[in-house]
C-alpha cells in the first residue's frame, strides 16, 4: 500500500518544459495552480515527471492554462539559498495525469 500519494485538480501555470540531464535522463517540469473556493486563495505546486513516455505526452498535450488532474507522490527538495540559509520545496513526482475540460466547458 502506497502511503505517500497526492491528487490535485487545477490549472497548468508554467508551460511544461523538458530538460535533458546527464546520465541519459530527462525531467519534464511544470506548475499547477489549485484555487480553493472556501478560502479564496490559490496554492501553487511544482510537478516533476521522470518517465520519458509520460513526459512526451505532457509536452504534446498540456499547455499553460489547461485544467488537469495530476496524481503522484510528494518529494521534499532541500537546497541552500544564495544567502547561505537552507530552504525546501515540495514537489509532486508525477505518476499520471488527465486533461480535463475547462470549468466553462463543464457548465455548457
Model feature map: region roles:
Residues 1-108:
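Single-stranded nucleic acid-binding surfaces, predominantly the OB-fold ssDNA-binding core
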Amino acid at each position: 500500500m502506497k502511503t505517500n500519494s497526492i491528487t490535485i485538480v487545477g490549472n497548468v501555470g508554467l508551460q511544461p518544459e523538458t530538460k535533458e540531464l546527464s546520465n541519459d535522463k530527462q525531467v519534464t517540469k511544470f506548475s499547477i495552480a489549485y484555487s480553493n473556493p472556501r478560502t479564496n486563495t490559490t496554492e501553487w505546486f511544482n510537478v516533476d515527471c521522470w518517465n520519458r513516455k509520460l513526459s512526451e505526452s505532457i509536452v504534446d498535450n498540456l499547455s499553460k492554462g489547461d485544467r488537469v488532474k495530476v496524481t503522484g507522490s510528494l518529494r521534499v527538495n532541500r537546497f541552500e539559498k544564495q544567502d547561505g540559509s537552507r530552504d525546501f520545496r515540495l514537489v509532486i513526482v508525477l505518476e499520471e495525469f488527465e486533461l480535463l475540460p475547462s470549468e466553462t466547458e463543464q457548465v455548457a
